[in-house]
Amino acid sequence: KVLTYNVEDDADEQRRRLSAALRPFGRFPRDIAGKVIRCGPSGVGTLIERDAMGQITLTAAWEGLRALLTQHRPDIVILDPLVELHTAEENDNTALRLVIAHLRELAQEFRCALILVHHTRKGATAGDMDSIRGAGSLVGAARAAFTVTPMSEEEAEALAISGVQRRHFVRVDSVK
């Protein structure tokens, strides 16, 4: 069972993306009913905040996520995007380590895997661990990290894929 906690995409966009992901397998969302729980963007929010004293604190949204995990007991939780789920300084290694520590404790408590979706910096290079935006401790704390980049014109040409079709392909590189 998978729970997605998505603060960027509305329900229609999430539905479209799930349908698109299933299409190559000849499957439909109804085929996995009850196995994918989609949350957001309404009713979700910032999980971890930095208070006026600079301390990292857990929010009401954190408790809401815990309630969802208690109710659904997912095997995998996808948090998308990480930057929208906390107010810690993105380039502060110490603050990000605390954010990750809370998320790790949550995963351990509920015995689930966490997938944190995070943006790359502008001008990022495919397959480069340093392309991941913000503090290096984010990648350091990860068990595995991947970059996802659109197919380049050069790659499409080499594979004889038309420009129109190119947008349907991405490159996934393991960077850790």
Residue ranges of each PLM-predicted region?
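Phosphate-binding/switch region of NTP-binding enzymes
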Residues: 20, 76, 94-176
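Conserved inter-motif catalytic segment of the P-loop NTP-binding fold
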Residues: 2-90
